[in-house]
Structures are given as structure tokens and as C-alpha cells.
Curated annotation (Swiss-Prot):
This is Chromatin modification-related protein EAF3. Involved in deacetylation of histones, chromatin assembly and chromosome segregation. May act as a transcriptional oscillator, directing histone deacetylases to specific chromosomal domains. Component of the NuA4 histone acetyltransferase complex which is involved in transcriptional activation of selected genes principally by acetylation of nucleosomal histone H4 and H2A. The NuA4 complex is also involved in DNA repair. One of its GO terms (biological process) is DNA repair. It is found in: Nucleus. Gene3D superfamilies: 2.30.30.140, MRG domain. Residues 104-128 are annotated as: Disordered. It comes from Eremothecium gossypii (strain ATCC 10895 / CBS 109.51 / FGSC 9923 / NRRL Y-1056). Its main location: nucleus. Component of the NuA4 histone acetyltransferase complex. Residues 118-127 have a biased composition (Low complexity). Residues 128-308 form the MRG domain. It comes from the Eukaryota. The gene is EAF3. One of its GO terms (cellular component) is NuA4 histone acetyltransferase complex. The lineage of its organism: Eukaryota, Fungi, Dikarya, Ascomycota, Saccharomycotina. Residues 8-80 form the Tudor-knot domain.
Length: 310
């Protein structure tokens, strides 16, 4: 993708697209970036691009109308050209979010009755692969919208560790679903899918699934421990799937089409994975009250200052 300095673009922030302006362009080959007045600037730790993301092209963007504390690096999974097609997608995502919020209010007003009509949850896939979208039950999409508001507007964080964790959720789904499958082939495909989601989550969480406000919390929760006084090596950092829970799993599943379209999977395999994602989402919708924690904690001014300055 080609995005010029000071050029307009659209970026995903949570479930919606926002207008943004490119301030810097990072080149992974040289490990440098350029901005309006400089080229070949070496990337420093304080520039805020995580080490695990430096092997891919990134853009440092400013969201129009937002404070500069929200300026951040985004990868190709989150940035889109500013054109009529993506502006239409931006409007559609807003309409979907409003519909999800309205459905959630209706569901709360009528306990015991759940909305079952699904709604597209994932952004359009990159042009180089098959165009795919995961259809997410509307009540789960409403949870993602609520999650976005809690973090970006109310400056809250999901309470960690979650119960159940992503690992717990995937294990429970596998046990229940595999008991319903008579075919050994179908059981094997299910096992491969669950293991793949588990692996994707652990690998993608830190650089794709977190809001800027959450990164410091991630470092504290999954950054490992300092060596003990005895000089013994620090214990391995916990897998994110053993710390984070349902709402972060929903974030991953909503992005899955883009992630798999960037791989060498053929189109048939991509559609199979999407179908598996939709089956998992349907199961999560029936157990949403138990699987997706609504526990959020307030952040202090000191935490916000450090987290948003990272």
C-alpha cells in the first residue's frame, strides 16, 4: 500500500473506521522512518513501535479531531486508502454499530430473548485475496462496540486475569463440539482450527488486538518476571490466552478473514476457516453471559500518562 506523508487515510480503531492523516512512514528493510522534513531516521525505542512489529511496514497516524495522545503506529491490517469504496464501508460500519447497540438495548429490555440475526463483523479483506467476512451474531457485535466505548471513551481496562480465559473458552468449545461430530475427519479439522486460533491469539494479541491504552497493562500481565535474588532465570511469560478472555477473542475472530487472506491458504481453505469461526461465534453467543466478562477497571491519571505516552 502507498500512503504519502500528510495524506489522508482511513484507519480501524476498534470496530469502526476513522479519518486519519499519515505523519510517518516506517520502512522495515532499513529500520528507519521518514516524515515531513526528514528521511532515513533510525527508529528508537521511544518511537513506540513494538519490536515484534518492526519486520512489517507501518504508518504513524493522527486521527482527525482527536488529541495527539492517540497518535499511533498502524499496520496494513488497520489502514485503508481514502476512497469512495472505503468511505462507504466506514458509513456501513457505523450503521452496523448502531444496529448492534439498539439490539443490545432490546435484549436487555426483554431478558430471556436473544436477537439471533447475524451481522457482518469483519472489515473487507485485502484486494490480493478472496473477499471474506465473518458474520457475527448481533449481540456479540454489541459487546465489541461496548468494549470499544469502555476503553476509548471511559478510559477503562478489562480486568485481568479473565475468567474464563481464551484457553478455557476454546477448550470448552472443543469438548462440546467434538462430541457432536461423528466423523474423525471433522474432529481432526475442528482440532486443527481450535489449535490455530489459540496460536493466532498468542501471536497477534500484542501488536494487533490491543488498544493503545491496553499496552502497558499487557506488559505488566504478560511481560515476564524479573530474575529472583537467587539468580535463577525468570519464569517464562504467561501465554496471553491464559490471561485474556472472551472480548479479546471476539476481536481476533472479527479480524480473522484479513489474517488468513494474508497467508498462502487457497480460497477453499479460507472459506472453511471462516465457517469454523462462525460456528465458534454462534456457540459463544449462546453462552455469552458466561464467556464474555463485563468486568472493567478504572485507570489512574498516572497510568494513562504512561500508557498513552508509550
Amino acid at each position: 500500500m502507498a500512503f504519502e506523508i500528510d495524506g489522508k487515510c482511513l484507519c480501524y480503531h476498534g470496530p469502526l473506521l476513522y479519518e486519519a492523516r499519515v505523519l510517518r512512514v516506517y520502512d522495515p528493510a532499513s529500520q528507519t522512518y521518514r516524515d515531513r522534513t526528514r528521511t532515513g531516521v533510525p527508529l528508537e525505542e521511544e518511537d513506540g513501535l513494538p519490536a515484534e512489529s518492526r519486520g512489517r511496514e507501518h504508518w504513524f497516524v493522527h486521527y482527525q479531531g482527536w488529541k495527539s495522545t492517540w497518535d499511533e503506529w498502524v499496520g496494513q491490517e488497520r489502514i485503508r486508502p481514502y476512497n469512495d469504496e472505503n468511505l462507504a464501508l466506514k458509513r456501513q460500519l457505523v450503521q452496523d454499530a448502531k444496529a448492534a447497540a439498539a439490539a443490545a438495548k432490546r435484549a436487555k429490555a426483554r431478558p430471556g430473548k436473544r436477537e439471533r440475526s447475524p451481522a457482518p463483523a469483519a472489515p473487507a479483506a485485502p484486494a490480493q485475496g478472496p473477499r471474506l467476512a465473518v458474520r457475527m451474531p448481533v449481540e456479540l457485535k454489541a459487546l465489541l462496540v461496548d468494549d470499544w466505548e469502555r476503553i476509548t471513551k471511559e478510559r477503562k481496562l478489562v480486568a485481568l486475569p479473565c475468567a474464563p480465559t481464551v484457553g478455557d473458552i476454546l477448550d470448552a468449545y472443543y469438548r462440546e463440539r467434538t462430541a457432536q461430530l461423528a466423523s474423525p475427519v471433522a474432529q481432526t479439522l475442528l482440532h486443527e482450527f481450535v489449535e490455530g486460533v489459540h496460536l493466532y491469539f498468542d501471536q497477534c494479541l500484542s501488536h494487533l488486538l490491543l488498544y493503545r491504552l491496553e499496552r502497558l497493562q499487557f506488559d505488566e500481565a504478560c511481560g515476564g518476571a524479573a530474575p529472583a535474588a537467587s539468580g535463577l532465570p525468570a519464569p517464562p511469560e504467561p501465554r496471553p490466552s491464559a490471561v485474556y478472555g472472551g472480548v479479546h477473542l471476539l476481536r481476533l475472530l472479527s479480524m480473522m478473514p484479513e489474517l488468513i487472506c494474508g497467508t498462502t491458504m487457497d480460497e477453499k481453505s479460507c472459506h472453511t476457516v471462516v465457517a469454523q469461526c462462525e460456528s465458534l461465534l454462534a456457540w459463544m453467543a449462546t453462552h455469552a453471559d458466561d464467556l464474555v466478562s463485563g468486568d472493567y477497571i478504572n485507570t489512574s491519571a498516572q497510568y494513562e500518562g504512561v500508557a498513552l505516552g508509550m
